[in-house]
């Protein structure tokens, strides 16, 4: 991919390019795949907040290349973290310190980390909620991601810089809804597995 970005196109005479590629040595596929890299900016404000800090990690997912594994319906760690944060915010006062998920733009995110702050007296409820959510995820992804789990790390009581409530709700909404192409766009019912991404398909 990096080489294609700097190739000297002046030596080419054609106007169309066929992708001939495969992960297996000696095998070639003539195919077409599309991808998208999107930079999203969500304006946020910060504030100081006292409370109990904890780290949450959605992990144990299969992940995989967005091309060769896209038909497996693997879970997206970023979307699951959005669900985790929404679940918690509906049940307790929640603030978000940081979020980080995914390593490559052409791979299904297999891990997502969040640093949160909750009232000290909600520690037990946090643990119970995470246990309940993990059971839900394991049931939903029993086939595609059976090892899915949510880890908790204690960061202790103190003052943290967190997203304002309005900023946090925007970020959680974005994670849960992912207003971007996610997963396979179209799978043919007649020819399996055939994935169609042509813009001119009727």
Regions found by a protein language model. Name each.
Residues 43, 59, 153-155:
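A structural detector for beta-sheet-dominated domains
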Residues 1-49, 73, 97, 195:
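Acidic/histidine-rich catalytic neighborhood of metal-dependent amide-processing enzymes
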Residues 47-51, 70-100, 120-199:
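Acidic-enriched catalytic cores of C-N bond-cleaving enzymes acting on peptides and small amides
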Residues 38, 54-56, 114:
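Hydrophobic residues positioned within well-ordered beta-strands of beta-sheet architectures
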Residues 67, 100-111:
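A structural signal for small-residue-enriched, beta-sheet-centric alpha/beta enzyme cores
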Residues 9-10, 46-51, 105-109, 199-202:
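Short glycine/proline-enriched loop/turn "hinge" motifs that connect secondary-structure elements
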Residues 49-67:
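Residues forming anionic-ligand binding surfaces in small-molecule and nucleic-acid pockets
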Residues 58, 116-120:
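Short beta-strand-to-loop capping motifs
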């Amino acid at each position: 991919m990096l080489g294609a970005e700097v190739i000297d196109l002046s030596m080419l005479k054609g106007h169309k390019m066929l992708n001939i590629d495969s992960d297996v040595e000696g095998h070639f596929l003539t195919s077409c795949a599309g991808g998208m890299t999107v930079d999203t900016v969500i304006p946020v404000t910060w504030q100081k907040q006292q409370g109990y800090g904890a780290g949450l990690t959605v992990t144990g997912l299969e992940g995989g290349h967005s091309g060769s594994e896209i038909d497996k319906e693997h879970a997206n760690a970023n979307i699951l973290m959005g669900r985790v944060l929404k679940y918690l915010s509906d049940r307790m006062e929640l603030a978000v310190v940081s979020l980080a998920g995914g390593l490559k733009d052409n791979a299904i995110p297999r891990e997502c980390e969040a640093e949160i702050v909750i009232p000290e007296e909600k520690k037990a409820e946090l643990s119970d909620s995470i246990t309940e959510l993990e059971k839900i995820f394991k049931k939903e992804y029993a086939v595609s991601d059976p090892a899915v789990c949510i880890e908790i790390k204690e960061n202790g009581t103190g003052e943290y810089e967190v997203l304002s409530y309005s900023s946090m709700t925007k970020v959680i909404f974005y994670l849960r809804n992912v207003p971007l192409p996610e997963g396979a766009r179209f799978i043919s019912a007649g020819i399996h597995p055939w994935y169609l991404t042509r813009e001119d398909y009727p």
